[in-house]
């Protein structure tokens, strides 16, 4: 449960499942194994819980989706991801507790308010990064781009001056790594404009709408089909690529059946997150295997039950709009 809760907070800072697994996994997987949990279970929990960070703001994937969808409110998307992200965490906690009791895993240290307060005092500066982005964007203090820049400067100051965990040599490595990631995203975003023009000119969205509506006029079945398509793509393509390619093609279908683009943002992100845990590509799966030393085949076998829990949450946020739309609605963002 601590592992899953840690992913919620870390995901709010990184917004990346791969970063979550690589960072927390290197610490928590050996720690859990030392306390009596087997490596397969420890790694499966770490990997599946890492997907929460892609839903809980600030999520850079939500921003990519907002651009691909034609300028949807980033604030609304951020708020729409909170409840699904927390719901996923709760479901994974309940399932992990069930497996722990069933397999007679050792009990951890009892919860205490003093321990919670100590942890909060240590992490309060880091959590400020999340507050800058979420509060700033939601309440219109600054844009998503401005909030990212301010949060970046804040995180740099905290890392080097408060926690003193980074020197200039490490800063250079961080900048290099960030530039590589940024270059990939910028190439995809720059290509999304011409790609969108081409598919519009060729009337591909209209053809997809007619084809899918020709199969069935049931909203339930159409949404199920869309989820299946994205899940399959998630096994072979990267997340940003799926968002940029799928969004302009499927958006007309979704609008024709009255499905909210805000709700689809959460559905799409969770679909892609599940893809990160499935072979043959499965980036998070390979990272987890590398950290724990458990072969991919055996690790995936132990991950399947957690994937089923994630699919359950996916169906819930697909067919229960209130899960994603209530919070943005209460804040007047819809």
Where are these regions (language model features)?
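Alpha-helical transmembrane segments of multi-pass membrane transport proteins
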Residues: 1-334
């Amino acid at each position: 449960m601590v592992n899953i809760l840690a992913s919620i907070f870390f995901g709010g800072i990184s917004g990346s499942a791969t970063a979550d697994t690589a960072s927390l996994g290197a610490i928590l997987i050996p720690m859990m194994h030392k306390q009596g949990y087997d490596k397969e279970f420890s790694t499966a929990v770490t990997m599946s819980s890492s997907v929460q960070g892609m839903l809980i703001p600030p999520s850079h994937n939500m921003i990519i989706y907002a651009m691909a969808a034609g300028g949807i409110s980033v604030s609304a998307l951020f708020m729409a991801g909170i409840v699904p992200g927390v719901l996923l965490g709760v479901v994974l906690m309940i399932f992990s507790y069930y497996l722990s009791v069933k397999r007679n895993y050792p009990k951890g240290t009892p919860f205490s308010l003093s321990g919670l307060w100590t942890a909060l005092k240590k992490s309060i500066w880091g959590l400020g990064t999340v507050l800058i982005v979420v509060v700033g964007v939601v309440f219109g203090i600054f844009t998503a781009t401005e909030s990212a820049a301010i949060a970046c400067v804040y995180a740099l100051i905290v890392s080097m001056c408060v926690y003193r965990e980074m020197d200039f040599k490490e800063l250079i490595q961080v900048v290099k790594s960030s530039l590589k990631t940024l270059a990939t995203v910028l190439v995809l975003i720059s290509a999304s404009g011409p790609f969108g023009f081409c598919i519009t000119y060729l009337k591909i969205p209209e053809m997809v709408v007619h084809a899918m509506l020709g199969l069935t006029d049931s909203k339930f079945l159409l949404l199920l089909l869309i989820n299946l398509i994205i899940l399959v793509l998630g096994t072979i393509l990267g997340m940003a690529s799926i968002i940029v390619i799928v969004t302009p093609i499927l958006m007309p279908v979704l609008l024709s059946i009255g499905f909210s683009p805000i709700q689809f943002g959460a559905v799409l992100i969770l679909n892609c997150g599940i893809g990160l845990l499935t072979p043959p590509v499965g980036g998070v799966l390979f990272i987890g295997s590398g950290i724990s030393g458990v072969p991919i085949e055996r690790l995936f076998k132990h991950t399947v039950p957690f994937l089923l829990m994630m699919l359950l949450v996916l169906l819930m946020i697909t067919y229960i709009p209130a899960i994603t739309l209530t919070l943005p609605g209460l804040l007047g963002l819809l």
